[in-house]
Amino acid sequence: GLEETYCSMRIKENI
């Protein structure tokens, strides 16, 4: 849910 979206956003920013 919310955690999955947050993790995805973090990974995208890292790249």
Curated annotation (Swiss-Prot):
Keyword Disulfide bond: yes
Keyword terms, alphabetized: Disulfide bond, Seed storage protein, Storage protein
Keyword field contains Ribonucleoprotein: no
Any GO MF annotation of the entry: nutrient reservoir activity
Function: Seed storage protein.
Family: Belongs to the 11S seed storage protein (globulins) family.
Subunit (UniProt): Hexamer; each subunit is composed of an acidic and a basic chain derived from a single precursor and linked by a disulfide bond.
Name of the protein described by the UniProt record: Globulin 2
Species this chain originates from: Elaeis guineensis var. tenera (Oil palm)
